[in-house]
Amino acid sequence: MKNADRGVAAELDGSDLRVAIVQARFNAAITEQLASSCIAELEALGVLAKHIKHVTVPGALEVALALQALAEQKDHDALIALGCIIRGETYHFELVANESGAAVTRVSLEHGVPIANAILTVENEAQAWARADEKGRDAARVAVEMANLMEDLS
């Protein structure tokens, strides 16, 4: 929801964090914008460029498998899922949106690693472009906040 009241987040310091991003290439121009915004925000929050791993996969359904492989490495404090699913004329939209979202959550819970899910699910390309920049930055902030919280809780 645009302009939603998100409350006040803790101070975000990513200087000691290692973060990995999995970007779906389907709807590539949009997901490139998501990735660019996300990486810029991670660096603004103090995450060193050398501590940001960025991989790509064909589409949203492949994101979770790459996240799982990264989670199993135990080298990252947080993971980020980036993608863009635009509604078409068939049920395929619901399938991809539901299954990719559930799989990302499952990986996070099974491996105890925070995953910021910025796989956009939109009605049309205009909605995707309207959200790409902010959602990329949001994903970075969520990843840093949750990585720090998990450290505090351990």
Swiss-Prot record:
A single Gene Ontology CC term: cytosol
Coiled-coil stretches noted in the UniProt entry, renumbered to this chain: none
Domain of life from the UniProt record: Bacteria
Biological or metabolic pathway of the protein: Cofactor biosynthesis; riboflavin biosynthesis; riboflavin from 2-hydroxy-3-oxobutyl phosphate and 5-amino-6-(D-ribitylamino)uracil: step 1/2
Example GO BP: riboflavin biosynthetic process
Keywords: Riboflavin biosynthesis, Transferase
Positions of disulphide bridges: none
Keyword Transit peptide: no
Reactions mediated catalytically: (2S)-2-hydroxy-3-oxobutyl phosphate + 5-amino-6-(D-ribitylamino)uracil = 6,7-dimethyl-8-(1-D-ribityl)lumazine + phosphate + 2 H2O + H(+)
Catalytic residues identified in the record: 92 (proton donor)
Residue sites binding (2S)-2-hydroxy-3-oxobutyl phosphate per the record: 89-90, 131
Pfam families: DMRL_synthase
Residues that, per the record, bind 5-amino-6-(D-ribitylamino)uracil: 26, 60-62, 84-86, 117
GO function terms (MF aspect): 6,7-dimethyl-8-ribityllumazine synthase activity
EC number: 2.5.1.78
InterPro entries, per the entry: LS, LS/RS, LS/RS_sf
UniProt function note: Catalyzes the formation of 6,7-dimethyl-8-ribityllumazine by condensation of 5-amino-6-(D-ribitylamino)uracil with 3,4-dihydroxy-2-butanone 4-phosphate. This is the penultimate step in the biosynthesis of riboflavin.
UniProt xrefs under NCBIfam families: lumazine-synth
Family: Belongs to the DMRL synthase family.
Protein name, entry field: 6,7-dimethyl-8-ribityllumazine synthase
Encoding gene (name): ribH
